[in-house]
Regions:
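Charged, amphipathic alpha-helical linkers/stalks
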Residues: 52-108
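Short, flexible loop segments at the rims of nucleotide/cofactor-binding pockets, characterized by
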Residues: 79-85, 211-213, 235-239, 326-329
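Walker A/P-loop NTP-binding motif
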Residues: 1-11
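Conserved SAM-binding loop
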Residues: 20
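Conserved helicase NTPase catalytic core signature
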Residues: 86-87, 91-97, 101-233, 243-247
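Conserved helicase motor core of SF1/SF2 NTP-dependent helicases
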Residues: 11, 16, 25-53, 57-67, ...
């Protein structure tokens, strides 16, 4: 797909304009062997963990994806599974969006601000400016509000404001908002949703992997999108291993065209995975294409796989090989 894009749009798009999101480097290493033939350098690659950590300014320690998978395999606690399932649901995304609106209406408490010895800015006027700039993300409003209020003071009182007074006003306005700590408002969300048990901090203040995307989503909603406009095409590998809330974060960061590849039956995390239909719902637009012809395996291997998990749409190619053997073992050591 990348080779096709570079060939078909030569001169319009180059390898540096494309980004791969992949859980491992095998995919990118394979691609890097193909691209030199097209006169291109390696395509930049990142992971979901890197993206989420960067959005959150690398503030938090967190369990990575493979740590989550390992825990599910070795000690799958029911409450851990329940937390993953809840945060991978569309209901969860909907509740987060409603909570962001709740913060808009309840987390800002305007108060009087004594700007100078003789001038006090009334709380009502401050509150009006918070609503005036409602198109801005909440945390982006504070500086704009302060500048506007000072401009009004200058017009009304012919006032020359010092830098110290300007900084004081910005600080006062920021402190009127009780959602300046991302982690605290994330905890508030679960209390507000009536599901406090759905958030659990691990030892050494480590976050679970499933908490990184919703925390990043809240951060982007309050701080504004850090849109990556230099990326012109995004390619996501192993699509089945990402949840709807992760795709919502991706959509905020990368508004470009995307190619999303994967196989829903190959998910290594059945509790937080996505099907093609779920991904289409998360993005609201896009075309789903199913590639049903299997070139990877012989007819015999594909037939065995069909006995384990049937897929009526799969079309094996008539390339024959040895019949796979099933070898029984009595214990793990023997195996």
């Amino acid at each position: 797909r990348i080779a096709y894009l570079l060939y078909a749009q030569k001169g319009k798009i180059s390898s540096k304009d494309i980004l791969i999101i992949s859980p491992n480097k095998v995919f990118a290493d394979y691609i890097s062997n193909v691209l030199p033939e097209l006169g291109e350098t390696t395509v930049p690659e990142t992971s979901m963990e890197q993206i989420l950590s960067t959005v959150l300014d690398n503030k938090y320690k967190f369990q990575n994806f493979f740590g989550q998978v390992s825990e599910l395999l070795e000690k799958p606690a029911p409450d851990f599974i329940e937390r993953i399932q809840y945060k991978a649901s569309f209901e969860f995304v909907s509740r987060l969006d409603k909570f962001i609106l709740h913060m808009e209406n309840h987390y800002f408490r305007a108060t009087d601000v004594k700007l100078t010895k003789y001038i006090t800015i009334p709380a009502e006027f401050v509150g009006e400016q918070f609503k005036r700039f409602h198109r801005y993300p909440i945390r982006q409003r504070f500086e704009t509000m302060a500048d506007y209020i000072l401009e009004m003071m200058k017009i009304q009182y012919n006032l020359t404001v010092t830098t110290a007074e300007k900084n004081l006003l910005r600080k006062e306005i920021k402190n009127m908002f009780s959602g300046n700590n991302d982690l605290q408002i994330y905890k508030d969300f679960f209390e507000w949703a009536g599901k406090p048990e759905m958030f659990k901090m691990r030892k050494n203040r480590m976050l679970e992997y499933a908490d990184m995307a919703p925390l990043a989503y809240l951060h982007l909603a309050l701080d504004g999108n850090k849109t990556q406009t230099h990326i012109r095409h995004l390619l996501i590998d192993e699509m089945q291993d990402y949840s709807p809330i992760q795709y919502k974060v991706i959509q905020k960061l990368y508004p470009c065209r995307k190619t999303i590849l994967g196989d829903a039956s190959q998910s290594v995390n059945p509790y937080g995975s996505s099907t093609a239909a779920m991904i289409q719902k998360a993005f609201t637009t896009g075309e789903v294409m199913k590639l049903c012809k299997s070139y990877r395996s012989t007819f015999e291997i594909t037939s065995l796989a069909q006995k384990i998990q049937a897929n009526n749409e799969l079309e094996p190619i008539m390339r024959h090989g040895e019949q796979p053997e099933i070898l029984p073992f009595k214990n793990a050591e023997e195996e």
